[in-house]
Amino acid sequence: MKQDETKALDREIGDYVAENTKVIWVDNHTMQIATMMIDSYGDTVYVWVEEAEDHCRVSDGGRILFKLDPNSEDEELNETAKEIAIGSGYQFDDDHFEIYVDVDRKNVAQAALKLAQLQVAISYLG
């Protein structure tokens, strides 16, 4: 009985995520994902996926730090966000304040959801 309940709950969680996550193509190589995550401002968290020949780049497009510090003046905030991103297994572009990771196609969903969670956490720094 417990195993059936666990499997049912697994399906329900998967269904919920699928129903509350929207993916659109913005061009021939880039997807925009509106995740089910909500940041500290109450806004939907977005993730972008750019397809390349041998990998996909999953990124925030530099948007979370732009939202927190539009003029890029808060060096401590940017450095803290960078440390958190790198510590979470992501890369950080110092020029564009973009958080990203390059992954195989099979790992895009996992990387996108983890990046959305990371953006939520970083949003509370502001």
Annotate the PLM regions.
Residues K22-I33, Q91-E98, Y124-G126:
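Short glycine-rich, low-complexity/disordered patches
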Residues F97-G126:
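Solvent-exposed, charged helical/coil patches
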Residues K2-S59:
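N-terminal ordered "arm"
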Residues V45-K82, G89-E98:
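Intrinsically disordered, low-complexity regulatory segments enriched in Ser/Thr/Pro
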Residues G14, Y90-D94, V103:
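Terminal targeting/leader modules
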Residues E12-I13, T80-I86, A112, Q119:
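Generic hydrophobic, helix-prone segments enriched in Leu/Val/Ile
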